A protein has these predicted regions:
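Acidic-and-aromatic substrate-binding clefts and catalytic sites of carbohydrate-active enzymes
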Residues: 18-19, 36-48, 67-77, 147-152, ...
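Gly/Pro-rich active-site loop or hairpin
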Residues: 43, 73, 110-120, 181-239
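C-terminal helical cap(s) of enzyme catalytic domains, especially alpha/beta-barrels
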Residues: 255-276
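Active-site acidic/histidine proton-transfer and metal-coordination neighborhood
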Residues: 75-170
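Acidic/histidine-rich catalytic cores of soluble enzymes
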Residues: 131-215
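Boundary/entry segment of secreted carbohydrate-active catalytic domains
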Residues: 1-21
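Acidic (Asp/Glu)-rich catalytic clusters
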Residues: 22-27, 44-61, 77-92, 128-133, ...
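Hydrophobic faces of well-ordered beta-strands that scaffold small-molecule active sites
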Residues: 7-13, 30-34, 59-62, 94-96, ...
């Protein structure tokens, strides 16, 4: 039976965090997220530490290799392995990127998709297959990009169309919206407002790298910048408070600095909840 979904502020689990999280101290986040490809089959001490954490805290999975946007057949052995991992560790939900990552071999990167009606139909069909195999809803994530492929749709319309055609949920990556808005010149606030609230399962926050004035790279290697924090508040204002996770893959700072960012997420969630109550006539 599928468990209750997560709430509050979460953090992406990286190997360097296993030791501090396993030291017996309280883990000051509400949930954790992992890429199943990086943890499936872990044995020995690392496997035991990971199992202890999955027994203590709610977990989400965020996949890297499913190739939702590709033309090659879906990797059914990978899907079955992911399903087993989800069941073994009582994972609350599974998400994947709206991207391609394989074509007669693994590309080891998340490649952009053409924003076309044909692409919508193909991706939606693959999402439906994944949902049937996993026997649970799939959550898809908007991705960062640095080049556009030919297509008749805008990114925002493509994402909305996939959600409706596939009847799936959205992981709204706020930093990716900001990065793409800067790189391609669209309105990040309008993009976020246009997403269907009922489809949004949770949100991602991260930092990025600036390559000059006109190019931003989604690295997950820096603190979240002020414009992205402002966009998170905007997302809550548009869609209500949602579970929100901080990603940090590189240049890991002391845990206290990561907690400062997850605490900031909680504060924005608290303010959003208070604003919602005021709009309903409660409080002053």
């Amino acid at each position: 039976m599928q468990r209750e979904f997560v709430s509050g502020a979460g953090l992406g689990l990286r190997r360097a965090l296993l030791e501090p999280f396993g030291a017996g101290d309280e883990v000051r986040v509400d949930f954790l997220e992992v890429a199943p490809e990086n943890w499936s089959g872990s044995g020995g001490r690392r496997g035991r530490q990971f199992r202890e954490l999955t027994e203590r805290l709610p977990f989400l999975c965020h996949g890297l290799s499913l190739n939702l946007g590709g033309y090659a057949p879906l990797d059914m052995s990978l899907l079955r392995a992911i399903k087993g991992f989800i069941e073994q560790h009582d994972i609350r939900a599974y998400s994947e990127h709206l991207s391609a990552c394989a074509d007669d071999g693994q590309l080891y990167d998340l490649m952009p998709l053409p924003f076309s009606d044909e692409s919508v139909r193909r991706v939606a069909e693959r999402v439906r297959v994944v949902q049937d195999v996993l026997e649970r809803p799939l959550i898809v994530e908007n991705v960062s990009a640095y080049a556009r492929l030919p297509g008749e749709l805008e990114e925002v319309d493509f994402v909305r169309a996939v959600l409706e055609e596939a009847d799936c949920q959205l992981l709204l990556d706020v930093n990716n919206v900001y990065v793409n808005a800067c790189n391609f010149g669209f309105d990040a606030h309008a993009y976020i407002a246009a997403m269907p609230s009922r489809r949004i399962a949770y949100l991602h926050m991260a930092g990025h790298d600036e390559q000059g004035a006109s190019l931003k790279i989604d690295t997950h290697g820096a603190p979240v910048c002020d414009p992205v924090w402002e966009l998170l508040a905007h997302a809550y204002a548009c869609h209500g408070e949602r579970p929100t996770l901080l990603e940090r893959d590189f240049n890991l700072p002391p845990l206290s600095e990561l907690y400062a960012e997850t605490d900031r997420i909680r504060e924005l969630q608290r303010r959003s909840g208070e604003a919602q109550l005021r709009s309903l006539g409660y409080g002053t």
